[in-house]
Amino acid sequence: MKINVEFEAPTWNQVYDMLLGQTEKIRQSGFKPDVIVGVLKGGWFSARVLSDLLEVPSLATVTVEFYVGVAETKNEPVLTQRISAVVAGKKALIVDDVADTGKSLKLVKDHVLQEGAKEVRTATVYRKPWSAIKPDYCEKETSLWIVFPWETKETVRKIVEKHCDKRAINMETAKLVKAGLPQPLVERFLKEILEERDC
């Protein structure tokens, strides 16, 4: 784990509000997707919400593996599940939670275009300033490590897996609470994970 990782932890309601704002931007742009493509795992929640808000019932998935830990990635993203629907001749909106390096988003966009989509646009909730790709629609830019509400336990587990030192674990999980994750939830997950773990 990188030293001095700082976190941003939006709540469910904050993410939903950002997606409401994003819906308006998409509508105002005149883009009307035929299919929404959620990048699993991180983009699934946002894709499902945008499917509802934009009233686009056609929802597909694609899976990319890139992250191996908190603030840690593989050298390159790997497409592990091809798109789950036919997109040939359709307008596709690719949705992910964050454009960090931009490599995953580029990989998926290239894949969807290769599958014959006639137009592809991208949407993320967050974007990092160093991302190689600027999504067509993005709600917020940050340089912090984002912990979404749908990955709280996963994040706590990755912190524990990096440390056998209880003090280091407590310091890192305290930063999660400071960023806005509910303390009782972090403590619950920490207790569950530590009970399974033998350092």
Map each language-model feature to its residues:
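PRPP-associated nucleotide enzymes
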Residues: M1-C199
